[in-house]
Amino acid sequence: MCGRYYLSIDLGNLSFVDNLSNYDFEDNFNIAPQASVPVVIDNSLVNCTWGYYPQWLKDQSNSKPLFNTRFESLLEKKTFISAFKKSRCLVPISGWYEWKVIDDAKQPFFFKHKDNENMFAAGLYWQRSDGTTEFTIITTAAPIEINEVHDRSPLILDDVSMGIWLSDDNPESIHQNISHDFGNNIEHFQVTRSVNNPKNNNPSLIEEFNEVPF
């Protein structure tokens, strides 16, 4: 699962985006579901809401948005089949958080590229009649290199898989050819529990943190 992430726009690895010079985004160290964040759609950065409410859902007040979608479900569940066929996107991500229970307390960990490079997660998006756009992050089984904290992970795409994800290939071919072998490029470490509160948003959240025993 991916319930929080960090994004700092990197001009270098977004050079393929058409509207980069006109786009302004402040670093966000604690992005939570329902936040408005940039997503790459048709080679442009578009402000989208993280979390999708199925259009058949009449009452959203008692429901939570789908901010993650399992890769394994893309060809199985009607909720996702249409978007998987024609509405795939890239989610720029500088790192993400996962939690693990240690000594009866949930300890947050931060995951990032070993070379501090920005990454792209696979995503799906839905355009609403009111002009807003919602998206979900695709998750997969966490690679063995990082699965000690959580058994799920965002599906991080390398350059080849980015091309496949955005291609016009048929969905079955895309599903079969996407690489899930990204674990060697990821490192993780404990961070402060201050990240538990989505109102906290500062660089200290992504710094390695070890409590000093008394």
What are these regions (language model features)?
Residues 1-214:
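Short linear sequence motif anchored by a di-proline
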